[in-house]
Amino acid sequence: MLENYGILDGTRWLTNRRGDSLEDTSRYPEGSILKVINHRMVQGVEMCDIKVDYYKYSGVEDGTYFWMGTDYLGRDLWVRMWRGARVSLLIAFISVICNVCIGIVYGSIAGYYGGKVDMIMMRITEIIGAFPEIVVVTLFILFFGTGILSIILCLVVQNWIGTARMIRSQFYRYKGSEYVLAARTLGVRDMALIFRHILPNSIGPIITRAMIAIPGAIFTESFLAYIGLGIRAPESSIGVLLSQGQKVMQQYPNQVFFPAVVISLLMIAFNMLSNGLRDAFDPTQRGA
């Protein structure tokens, strides 16, 4: 019995139930009636190829063009790419904000009090940071499933450690300053000293580090989606588009090229922004 087997370049090809092409007549004896019938059927199919206009059946008007082509389901790659970039940026910004908040609180306490408090808190960060990131990500995906919240948690669970260490070093630098000693002599409480007198001097390094962390978060999210541990279709992100485009890269290289260009431009832009902020807050680092 004949059935539709697939579509190639808009043409429907007929096969039998076994999946053999109708042009394969080697299984029939020479001169048999089955071979003659098969040959006639192939000639009929070749003369009556059915062309399918997918854009017409999808309701796309004539004269409509897609700047970057379409994906394997006919969806506009331009629209999907920028929606995916929006998701990637959302995940990156939320995760970086959470990292900065946790790092500020943790590093401020460790740096201000010092001594045993600092030693215990730093040993905790070393224990957390000792686990390989891919192991932590896999465990989170197993327990919480895939989705935006899971990816944000994966990016937060370890990445705040660097911010905490940076804040700790800033507190060690400023807590012995004369204005801090004067405020302490006047009876200013510890929390006020931390958040009103010492922390404002660290705003520049904090902002610079946050801007540097955003490209890393974008790349990590895209990498997780690419290997199947992040956001999955039908949701869109840069990593999802790269993963789907990689399957048809030889036939349709545009499905990989344009998402790769977008993620590269995003990372370059944020790196340049972070370098500019670093030079603005710390002129001694200019040109480094």
State what each model feature region is.
Residues 1-73:
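Membrane-topology segments of multi-pass transport proteins
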Residues 70-288:
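Alpha-helical transmembrane segments of integral membrane proteins
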